[in-house]
């Protein structure tokens, strides 16, 4: 592949000058260029993150087909770092689809939270981009209603909010227009001045326009002096074929290192704490295998239905929406072997090994459900098919339970049960680890015939009210020998006073810093889809009808039979939580 080198136009070192200006006369090239000596031997390169936001100077590299391979792809391979102050670099964050709900409710508030905590670099700007016609002031008014300061830190809240909004701008354009992205590039350069510019694009848009946006941004609005990164929201296709095609299309314009596939569940506090709990506590790591763990449950439930999102949801269903990504990613993180280090690639390598070791899903190990209408006194709840955006007679599941198995030495024979559903009796997301019975239990007379009541259980509650608790057996005070099941409880809001950052805050900061540990690599994505695609095709070809369950119930009865088939009792239905 032939390459051409373009010198950084915003260098401060002497050697050459340039009179280049914007068409309004504003200079966008500094007067001087940087010339670095040619070396035939490799230098001592510095990779990763030198500090929270390490400024960089380097060349821009183009492939022989004319597409830019600048940014992370060069930065992370062999890019010499120079001693620049924080004032010499800037980060420009462009939210594509800024008028949508995700941008207004999650992305922009998360950016403000990072700014409030002084986690963003000194020089940054935020641009909203969408087809909606808005002015800068209209964007600021729109997002100001969704910005909040930390509950536990309200100092200078109004002033901080005002300063953040002053850095927010808007550009209206079509998603497939190179000219519109060239205009965005012009506006970005005006704000960036002569600093080394790093650019982050967040694609908060439907997946069918990902490639158009990436093409236009890569060709017309990528950085010529710093890195360029793109955050891609799920869904990443509907099956293995469409996902692979999306990846191939994106890689025409980006390298794998520039693509940050986000799964916001991996940014949740308790998911991050999972590895800490296991690998830094001797009491848990020796137990983390088939020898002591009887089953593991990954549970996601919502107490509301699709409520206006039925048109989108009906195209994907609960398996694609929750199980194939959120729950499967957590399963891989839970079950992986000890990585060589905490480096992103080492962790993701181990996750891929887990996914590739999983047994193909069987139809008899899957239960489907769909919520139906239900009346509770004076209040009535609609059925899924009552949603006007849902096609008549839809058999798209709003609930699913599945039993999965990992065919390796550590987990052979241990059922990993997933359960996800809408319009259930409670809102909950948790991991439940049920341990084996005590061999020859001396106190089995006290438990009667149901020895499941005597098993220990470790629970990591992701939402709501983050908590970790361990269920143990203990003696009730008194003269007799009466046993009771108790919880050793770590409730986060009671232990830690500070407000827990939102998952989007952590993931946005990681993307800015170039930390990929919580983002999904392309081979991870392929392995996840390879597991679920045959099942999804079989369900669609056979038109398997879901079992109906009342809105606000505990789900279809079939889920209980599935658990019983594998000698498991759902932990969230035991009634003692």
UniProtKB/Swiss-Prot annotation:
GO terms for cellular component: chloroplast. PROSITE patterns: G6P_DEHYDROGENASE (PS00069). The keyword S-adenosyl-L-methionine does not apply. Transmembrane segments: none annotated. Homodimer. NCBIfam families: zwf. This is Glucose-6-phosphate 1-dehydrogenase, chloroplastic.
């Amino acid at each position: 592949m032939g390459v051409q080198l373009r010198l950084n136009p915003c260098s401060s070192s002497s050697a050459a000058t340039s009179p280049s200006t914007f068409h309004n006369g504003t200079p966008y090239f500094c007067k001087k260029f940087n010339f670095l000596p040619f070396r035939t031997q490799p230098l001592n390169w510095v990779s990763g993150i030198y500090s929270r936001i390490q400024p960089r100077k380097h060349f821009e590299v183009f492939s022989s087909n004319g597409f830019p391979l600048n940014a992370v792809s060069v930065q992370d391979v062999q890019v010499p770092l120079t001693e620049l102050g924080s004032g010499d670099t800037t980060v420009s964050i462009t939210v594509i689809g800024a008028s949508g709900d995700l941008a207004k409710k999650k992305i922009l508030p998360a950016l403000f939270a990072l700014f409030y905590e002084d986690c963003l670099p000194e020089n940054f700007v935020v641009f909203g981009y969408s087809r909606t016609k808005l002015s800068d002031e209209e964007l600021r008014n729109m997002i100001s209603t969704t910005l909040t300061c930390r509950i536990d830190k309200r100092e200078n809240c109004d002033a901080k909010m005002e300063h953040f909004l002053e850095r927010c701008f808007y550009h209206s354009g079509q998603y497939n227009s190179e000219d519109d992205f060239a205009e965005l590039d012009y506006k970005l350069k005006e704000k960036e001045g002569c600093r080394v510019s790093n650019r982050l694009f967040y694609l908060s848009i439907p997946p069918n326009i990902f490639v158009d946006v990436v093409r236009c941004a890569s060709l017309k609005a990528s950085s010529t002096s710093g890195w360029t990164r793109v955050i891609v929201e799920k869904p990443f296709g509907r099956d293995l074929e469409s996902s692979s095609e999306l990846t191939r299309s994106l890689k025409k314009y980006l390298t794998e290192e520039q693509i940050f596939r986000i799964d916001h569940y991996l940014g949740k506090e308790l998911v991050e704490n999972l590895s800490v709990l296991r690998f830094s506590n001797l009491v848990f790591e020796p137990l983390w295998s088939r020898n002591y763990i009887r089953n593991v449950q990954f549970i996601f439930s919502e107490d509301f239905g699709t409520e206006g999102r039925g048109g989108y949801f009906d195209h994907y269903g609960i398996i694609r929406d929750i199980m194939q990504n959120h729950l499967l990613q957590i399963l891989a993180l839970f079950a992986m072997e000890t990585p060589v280090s905490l480096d992103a690639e080492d962790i993701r390598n181990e996750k891929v090994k887990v996914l590739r070791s999983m047994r193909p899903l069987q139809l008899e190990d899957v239960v489907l459900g769909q919520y139906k209408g239900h009346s509770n006194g004076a209040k009535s709840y609609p059925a899924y098919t009552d949603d006007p955006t849902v096609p008549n007679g839809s058999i798209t599941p709003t609930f699913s339970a599945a039993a999965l198995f990992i065919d390796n030495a550590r987990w052979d024979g241990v059922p990993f049960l997933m359960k996800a559903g809408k319009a259930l009796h409670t809102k909950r997301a948790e991991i439940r680890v049920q341990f084996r019975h005590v061999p020859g239990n001396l106190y089995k007379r006290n438990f009667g015939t149901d020895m499941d009541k005597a098993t220990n259980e470790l629970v990591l509650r992701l939402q709501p009210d983050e908590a970790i608790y361990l269920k143990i057996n203990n003696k009730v005070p008194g003269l007799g020998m009466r046993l009771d099941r108790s919880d050793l409880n770590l409730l986060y809001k009671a232990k830690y006073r500070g407000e827990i950052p939102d998952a989007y805050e952590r993931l946005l900061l990681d993307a800015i810093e170039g930390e990929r540990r919580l983002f999904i690599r392309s081979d991870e994505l392929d392995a996840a889809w390879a597991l679920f695609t045959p099942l999804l095709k079989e369900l669609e070809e056979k038109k398997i009808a879901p079992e109906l369950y009342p809105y606000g119930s505990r789900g279809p009865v079939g889920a209980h039979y599935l658990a019983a088939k594998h000698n498991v009792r759902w932990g969230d239905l035991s009634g003692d939580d």
